[in-house]
């Protein structure tokens, strides 16, 4: 009887301890990393044409000021990163926030990121995220330090920087990442009034090694009320090739179509070609050369009051970067745009060419608190 009692007691103790052990060993119970992030980018820009207003062009939404010092973007936020869940909340201000969030009401203008995500499987290669998050469209970030050029390319300025919705991210291997998203519209936090149709997008990233990557992203949706709904279809394709530790090349091609009217079979098409070459002279000094062409002559995503139509222009820029440490950047850029139309303000008239210079000072910090 004594042996039976001992065996029974040991069995009960083992069973009772299982939940506690399972809880202790569960990846959900692991302590997450908590990171405090901050960024500040100040700039001065001067337009040779000397426009009569302090904004340069209606199709720019970053660094779009003339002959003044200003803050393009400043944010502060917290992020949580754990094996099974993650989240980020960042609040921002600056001319970028003012221009890109012009359609958003009240305090929504101050949301840079606000999203949460959870892992959907044991391998943690299938994730669901929801909230306000960076757009999958484009090869540039609002944070200039993350980009090869100081100012934003025409392709990125006229496609979404952020989306609001939910997305599923699947990473079957180190080479491939697949994403699907449903969102409130083309760079929207709050949906357009009386629009009952959500928008959709996809992304495919192929990274065969550290030197090369290819990204193909799409968007399907509308940004208009139901009674005037015009469908939009957009494709964003680019590749990054880091040939050596010093020299890299980026090439991109965007094309989109929007219905000319509700239920119309006619579409207004726009496209953008972009190329950027970057050379790092040392760990602290680098330079980039950009060439681009933007054609939206029917005004699908741009509108020029003078033409009562859209933008057609080509452009070239060169920038020099000095980074004394990885968290600080001093940058200078010269940029030239030329259009077949006289669209660029010069004093009280319009010309075909636009030349402007931009300098910036940026600081970006990430501090782990846990």
Predicted regions, residues:
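Residues on the lipid-exposed face of transmembrane beta-strands in outer-membrane beta-barrel proteins
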Residues: 38, 42, 67, 71, ...
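Transmembrane beta-strand segments of Gram-negative outer membrane beta-barrel proteins
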Residues: 27-56, 128, 212, 355
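Outer-membrane beta-barrel "beta-signal"
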Residues: 322-324, 328, 351-370
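Detector for outer-membrane/organellar transmembrane beta-barrel domains
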Residues: 175-178, 195-196, 202-310, 314
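Residues that define the transmembrane beta-barrel architecture of outer-membrane proteins
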Residues: 32, 67-72, 107-112, 160-164, ...
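Surface-exposed coil loops of outer-membrane beta-barrel proteins
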Residues: 22, 47-68, 96-113, 121-205, ...
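Transmembrane beta-barrel strands of outer-membrane/channel proteins
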Residues: 38-46, 89-93, 130-132, 180-184, ...
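Outer-membrane beta-barrel channels and translocator barrels
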Residues: 31, 81-83, 121-123, 135, ...
């Amino acid at each position: 009887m004594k042996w039976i009692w001992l065996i029974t007691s040991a069995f009960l103790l083992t069973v009772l301890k299982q939940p506690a052990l399972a809880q202790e060993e569960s990846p959900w119970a692991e302590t997450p990393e908590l990171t405090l992030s901050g960024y500040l980018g100040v700039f001065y820009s001067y337009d040779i044409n000397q426009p009569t207003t302090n904004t340069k062009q209606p199709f720019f939404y970053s660094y779009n000021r003339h002959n003044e010092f200003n803050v393009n973007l400043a944010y502060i936020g917290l992020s949580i990163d754990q094996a099974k869940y993650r989240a980020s909340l960042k609040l921002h201000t600056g001319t970028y926030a003012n221009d890109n969030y012009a359609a958003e009401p009240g305090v929504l203008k101050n949301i840079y990121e606000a999203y949460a995500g959870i892992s959907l499987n044991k391998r943690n290669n299938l994730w669901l995220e929801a909230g306000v998050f960076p757009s999958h469209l484009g090869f540039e970030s609002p944070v200039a330090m993350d980009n090869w050029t100081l100012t934003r390319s025409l392709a990125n300025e006229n496609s979404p920087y952020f989306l609001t919705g939910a997305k599923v991210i699947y990473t079957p291997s180190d080479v491939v990442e697949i994403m699907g998203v449903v969102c409130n519209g083309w760079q929207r936090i709050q949906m357009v009034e009386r629009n009952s149709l959500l928008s959709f997008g996809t992304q495919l990233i192929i990274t065969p090694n550290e030197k090369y990557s290819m990204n193909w992203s799409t968007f399907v949706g509308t940004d208009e009320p139901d009674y005037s709904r015009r469908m939009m279809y957009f494709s964003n394709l680019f590749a990054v090739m880091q040939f050596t530790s010093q020299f890299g090349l980026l090439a991109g091609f965007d094309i989109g179509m929007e219905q000319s009217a509700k239920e119309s079979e006619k579409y207004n098409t726009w496209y953008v070609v972009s190329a950027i070459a970057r050379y790092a002279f040392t760990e602290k000094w680098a330079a980039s050369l950009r060439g681009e062409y933007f054609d939206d002559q029917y005004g699908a995503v741009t509108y020029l009051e003078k033409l009562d139509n859209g933008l057609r222009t080509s452009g070239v820029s060169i920038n020099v970067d000095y980074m004394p440490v990885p968290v600080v950047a001093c940058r200078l850029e010269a940029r030239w745009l030329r259009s077949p139309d006289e669209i660029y303000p010069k004093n009280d008239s319009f010309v075909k060419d636009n030349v402007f210079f931009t300098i910036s000072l940026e600081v970006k910090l990430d501090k782990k608190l846990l």
